[in-house]
Amino acid sequence: MNWPNMPPGDRRWLWIGLTLPLCLLNGWVLLQILDYFQSPLRIFIIANLVAFILGYPVRWLQRYPRLKLPYAVALVLLTTAIILAVIGLLVIPKLVDQIRTVLQLLPHLNALGDRHLESLDNLSNQWEIPTNFRAWGRELSNEFPNQIRSITNQLINLLIWTAGSLVEAGFIFIMTVYLLLRGQTFWDGIFRWLPIDWRHKVRQRLRHSFQNYYIGQATVAALLGVSLIISLSIFQVPLALLFGMFVGFMAFFPFGGGTSIVLISIIASFQSIWLGIKVLAIATVVDQVVENGLAPKLLGRVTGVHPVWILLSLMIGAKVAGLLGILVAIPIASFIRDMLNDFI
């Protein structure tokens, strides 16, 4: 085979055919390594994510007030601790009260929902539409307590894991501080392992992928959550804080905002059909204003990854590393796409 004289198209497909099996084999080996070193890798990834987010205010303090790096890091960590403490003291007690209220109202909401479904059945019978909303409602009602118990058990396990992982949390904090102070030299050493022609491009693409995704998703989630809390409170919707924080948290994940809006609307409709419609209308308007009005002007292009690849990367990330895999799946997919576009 005369490689230099091959047509460019054939050469490209031959290169893909030769490298694809090697990539799959290396990927399988990488999965085994990730599974074996799960705990230290989890500490490393979380510390890097926290340092990546806190690095922005640190660099800002170095640039404008011209603080030295250790003082900037100390100020950012202290400010973050104060903000978390204030949120814990002011928001969490009210949030816990609203969660307790929802749990106490579950039997009542179940009965109300059954009556609403009966009304829908009667209406559909008048129009001679073959439906059986009550049967569907009973199936959901029978399954709902099981899901609540499952979620409760998961929360208890999470609390046990949190109590037993204080050492891990300490390692995360220490590594975060070191990455804020000496992260530049650490990554310089990592990227020296790459070929000279790749170093700058890989580093730039990797930073841009994570930066675009996390800044974009965090901005949209914060704007959506705060705007929804304010809007629902203005219209005197019960559980406005719980609904707004839930939607804001879910909006950090792709497709989470719309899914959570539908979910809170269904929960509100168990109390009153008009309340559910009201919540759906308010949340939809706020979501459209944030995602189609404010977010594009503030963020522009975020990842550019096709929705199908987003779903696939989320499923793969969840399979490989659970919630942590979901958090890093989209920026990694964006990075891989950019690198393939550059080198293929």
Swiss-Prot record:
<feature type="transmembrane region" description="Helical">
    <location>
        <begin position="310"/>
        <end position="330"/>
    </location>
</feature>
<feature type="transmembrane region" description="Helical">
    <location>
        <begin position="262"/>
        <end position="282"/>
    </location>
</feature>
<feature type="transmembrane region" description="Helical">
    <location>
        <begin position="14"/>
        <end position="34"/>
    </location>
</feature>
<dbReference type="InterPro" id="IPR002549">
    <property type="entry name" value="AI-2E-like"/>
</dbReference>
<keyword id="KW-1133">Transmembrane helix</keyword>
<keyword id="KW-1003">Cell membrane</keyword>
<keyword id="KW-0812">Transmembrane</keyword>
<dbReference type="GO" id="GO:0055085">
    <property type="term" value="P:transmembrane transport"/>
</dbReference>
<feature type="transmembrane region" description="Helical">
    <location>
        <begin position="41"/>
        <end position="61"/>
    </location>
</feature>
<dbReference type="Pfam" id="PF01594">
    <property type="entry name" value="AI-2E_transport"/>
</dbReference>
<dbReference type="GO" id="GO:0005886">
    <property type="term" value="C:plasma membrane"/>
</dbReference>
<feature type="transmembrane region" description="Helical">
    <location>
        <begin position="215"/>
        <end position="235"/>
    </location>
</feature>
<protein>
    <recommendedName>
        <fullName>Putative transport protein sll0060</fullName>
    </recommendedName>
</protein>
<feature type="transmembrane region" description="Helical">
    <location>
        <begin position="72"/>
        <end position="92"/>
    </location>
</feature>
<feature type="transmembrane region" description="Helical">
    <location>
        <begin position="237"/>
        <end position="257"/>
    </location>
</feature>
<keyword id="KW-0472">Membrane</keyword>
<keyword id="KW-0813">Transport</keyword>
<feature type="transmembrane region" description="Helical">
    <location>
        <begin position="155"/>
        <end position="175"/>
    </location>
</feature>
<comment type="similarity">
    <text>Belongs to the autoinducer-2 exporter (AI-2E) (TC 2.A.86) family.</text>
</comment>
